[in-house]
Amino acid sequence: MHNQANHRPIIVMGGNGRVGREVVRYLLRHTHHKIIIASRSAHSASANGATPNDPRLVSLVLDANDPQALRQAFADAALVIACIGPSGVLGERVARACIEVDTPLIDAGGYDPLLKALEARQHQEPVDVPLIISVGLMPGLTGLFPKYVIDSTAHGRTPLRLDTCCIGRDAWTYNSAWDIVHSLGDFGQDRGFPVIRHGVHRSVGFFKAMRKVTFPGQIGRVSTMLMPSEELARLARQLNIPEARAYGSNVGPRAALACLRAKLLGQFRTPEKIHRAAQRLAKASARDLRNLQPVYGLRVDVTYADEQRESATLVVADTYQATGVAIAITARCLLEGDPLANGVQMLHEAIDSRRFMQLFRAEGLLAIDGLTAQPHPEWQGGLS
């Protein structure tokens, strides 16, 4: 990939958005490729704010609803990065065009519906390029960081149980809010509050689904609930882990209430209801940030066959910046020739966890506690 595509451009769809801007900034620093910022309307490349007047930035008007235009634009690209949404509205359009012209794809979203659709297509006809989807913080880092913890602590031991707890708070964009509301209905699968046993979701009772988790700094103690996670189920199957549990919570108080309302009223069932609930969630989360700071936290607990437990916690203060950097690091690994399989895959299945985390930590965006006895200077002063 590195030798063949070195002079071909990278297309960043949604490169003028909050996540897309971070992707472009990183790629300008760490690659030599021309970067095409594709959007629905005529924005200049300098409006991106990454590096004004950088000769490597080019703008392109591109409609994700026009399959022919997508194929034409993607045919000469080294890589397509999709930072557009909502994922539940976008569907397979971008991925399908990439498959048809044999261009690799990194998608910030996608989630379970796209994963299943692409796997079904892949069973009918082989896909000749990597399609890495759900490359963000959740899902994305929620699969790769647990893999990293296991890769760093197993030392030949067999993991018997894996628990993850993910919390988040930010002023969610409408597209993010749309996908959050859509996920509240488990994308139509209705698996309740599940424990993952031998890679399969098994629902448990409401009171068995709750867990309180303590995060570092000023985040403190947080109430979380079991939630379905196809990503964690795939990781458990990949590593033959008998039991896994994914807990989560939206820790913005107003946003949490908006999510609870959407869940109880079934506002995830139709696009019209999702639209209205997403608008309310976006407004509620913006109000949360009048007095609170954005934060993303992920705790991982691994229990091994020797009955020893290893724990690690990761905290990020800027969720959209970190999401963009995670996407861009994935792109960097692909462009630099890391050995990647063809076909649809999630982040933890595609990229070596230790290489990814080494590059991520070098950006100074995250704090990790629990994997080393060495002090972390990023913790100094605490987190708010």
Segments from the language model and where they lie:
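C-terminal catalytic/substrate-binding lobe primarily of soluble NAD(P)-dependent oxidoreductases
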Residues: 3, 20, 151-384
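N-terminal Rossmann NAD(P)H-binding glycine-rich loop of SDR-like oxidoreductase domains
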Residues: 10-28
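Conserved S-adenosyl-L-methionine
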Residues: 29-34
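N-terminal Rossmann-fold cofactor-binding loop
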Residues: 38-42, 64
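Conserved Rossmann-fold cofactor-binding substructure of NAD(P)-dependent oxidoreductases
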Residues: 61-77, 86
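Short acidic/histidine-rich motifs immediately flanking catalytic phosphotransfer sites
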Residues: 74-80, 100-101
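ADP-ribose/adenylate-binding Rossmann-like module
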Residues: 86, 95-115
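Rossmann-fold NAD(P)-binding glycine/threonine-rich loop
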Residues: 108-130
